[in-house]
Amino acid sequence: MSIKYIGLQNWREDLSSCSKHITLLFLVFQGCWSISEMLKFRSIYAVRELRRFMNWDQENNQIFNKLLLVGFFSLLWWSSMSSLSYAQITPQGRDQTYKQAAPGRFEERFKQKKLPQSQVVPVKPDNLRPVFPAEMRKVKFLLQRMIIKGSTIYDKRKFSRLFRKYLHKRVNLEQVYMIAQEITNMYRADGYILSKAVVPPQKIEEGVVQIDVIEGFVNRVTIQGRVRGPRKLLNEYRKALLRSRPLKARDLERYLLLVDDLPGVSVKSVLTPSKFKQGATNITLIFDTKGYEGSVGADNRGTKFNGPVQINAGVSANSFFKNYERIGLQGVVTSNTDELKFFRGFYEQPISSEGTKLFFSGSFSESEPGSALKSFEVAGESKTFTLRLTHPFVRSRSENLNGFVGYTNRDSETKILGELDSEDRLRIVNLGMSYDFVDAYRGINLVSFNLSKGFDIFDSTKTGTAKLTRLAGHSDFTKVTGEMLRLQQLAPSWMLLGELSWQYSFDKLLASEEFGVGGAKFGRAYDSSEITGDQGLAFKLELQKAFQPKKKYLRDLQAYAFFDYGKVWNRIETTAGSKTQDLDSLGIGIRFNITDMISGYMEWNKPLNRKVASEGNKDGRAFFSLTAKF
């Protein structure tokens, strides 16, 4: 019998185990031979008696004895091999099961990547200076006093800095208009985009000049297009814009983006000056709504145990109950559906006009890994429920600050050879934030932080309970995780992406809470969660070059090359006898948009410092993904 080595036991242990079984078989053989001789004697006697009636000969008697002996040895061989298979379930094999095939880690594996909301907005530099008629320079007078009317934002001292140097001096009319322009610039610099200063028609007497400030505001908001949800929420956004007097750019941007963030809603705004009120502006919101969204795709990012081909599909309904809610389903299966099944449903609901959202999700996953783990009859399942409250403290095109608080309830169990091997029931409270922004160098940045705390509540498995995924793991753990990302334009069509992810734990963790390296995000030449630990650090650098072929069936193309590295630290030694593990890889690839709906990537990756556990080598590997959205 040939047993494939998968890191479960070294060859000396295999040899020792096999030699013990061979010795046992030899002793059993001797005993069975003695029994067979006795059986032979009795069978001969029985046959002689039967020959009196049936005329059997000696040859038939020998065949009967041989069949009896072969059947007996077959039973012993089957029993021996069953015992031998069970002996192969070593700590190393158990570790590999919980790294790459345990359903408790699928939630993290299939989680959608968080992307920055900020974007670089093209802005043309304002190099144009106002041009005034030359005749203005000829109109000169002694400036004794300047009156600024109409401002509700700034006090007199703020304005006096702008014209103090001109007082009690001879000035021309052009200089007066320049002062008005400086007041306008001051308002615009502070975000009052509709406000301005003007010099009204007047007769200058005794050196007194008046400048009027027109503080712009929103007078009316109208909506065009189909509205799928209640107008009550839209009215709240409308009132917020009307309250912003004078109108600030950050208020206009925030509430327009919050409307655009509603599920299935895409909005454009048109600003027009009012014909009846000075300083008033009317806003028209043009709605484009989508009732549902979906996608279907395939990739080979699975493992030999679960995959490698994965088929994923998702669909979400927007405002199905006419309340601006979003309801969605996601599913992932492998080509052999018994090896992996993952299903997730979610519900998201806005609960305030300031962008606060309530989010529910529930997922179920099932795993019966194949390949070298198939003979161990590994079977696991996981159920996760999540409740989260999110709020955008800052929402704009160039800067966003989001906070959240959440609760996760996760139950998972794994059986090996039909026996319960582990059972984790975790109750976790999360608190976190994410901040993304565009800096002065036109780089897009993302920083996120998450604090997770486990509690022994609601029938959780307590620390020290038997049959945990990691016997020393804590269910009442505390850990912090974080991510950093920067996307920098180097030149037209050239970009450099840098990304860092980390985790620090104050306790020994259970398997589903460990930091994993390997898979589509970090350690791309390796399988998902190739190495795991209580603490971890991973980073990648990716150079990107964009092309625009503008072909009918090839809209966009991006070539890239990357290097990534990851390391994990454990608070206790692993079964390999080490507290640290690391890996690195490099690769090249292309991303493409075939049409507006179909996209994908192809890449070739090379493991560098360690072998891929499931492959047993460091050969290059090819990966692909193809997705259709509708």
List each model region and its residues:
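Residues that define the transmembrane beta-barrel architecture of outer-membrane proteins
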Residues: 279, 307-311, 339-343, 381-385, ...
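Transmembrane beta-barrel strands of outer-membrane/channel proteins
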Residues: 271, 296-300, 313, 329-333, ...
